[in-house]
């Protein structure tokens, strides 16, 4: 990776605004570089964290399927950081290592119907910026309208995050280097 355009903050040298934003992450262990970078813009970070928290922890999506979508959009956006970080989160959400690798191939292959639809919807959102009528109708057989809204916002959120991570050059955290994004 090239030198970051925006260097993450030094955890040992935080101003009051950054410390306030990062305190929950500090309490839970060392904050990841994404948070140390975004804390350089405290107003943005405060507001983004509310939305991010909804998408990752409070949405109506089942965690496993949420991670299918996040990993797929991370892969499609070629976001090394997103892919590495969510391989861990996806595994914690119940995805097997083989499934995580299969996400690279998209909705084709040996997925159950719901998994295939989640991946297909993610691909459609990436390519067309909307879910097709056919995919939407099929997903409604499994999920509520609120869940489909959360799916759209999850894919949008992680598209945005992938863009920021790549543009800012956020470096991989030390513990993520073994989980690098490798394209075919």
Located regions from the model:
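Conserved small/polar residues in nucleotide/adenosyl-binding loops
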Residues: 181-184
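Preference for long, well-ordered alpha-helical segments
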Residues: 145-172, 177
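Short alpha-helical scaffolding segments that buttress acidic/His motifs in well-ordered protein cores
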Residues: 35-38, 48-55, 68-74, 103-104, ...
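Secretory/endomembrane lumenal or extracellular ectodomains immediately following the signal peptide
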Residues: 1-63
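Acidic/histidine-rich alpha-helical segments that form the ligand environment
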Residues: 105, 113-152
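Histidine/lysine/aspartate-rich catalytic loop segments that bind and position anionic ligands
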Residues: 91-101, 106-107, 111
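Conserved alpha-helical segments that form or flank metal/cofactor-binding pockets of metalloenzymes
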Residues: 61, 65-68, 73-93, 97
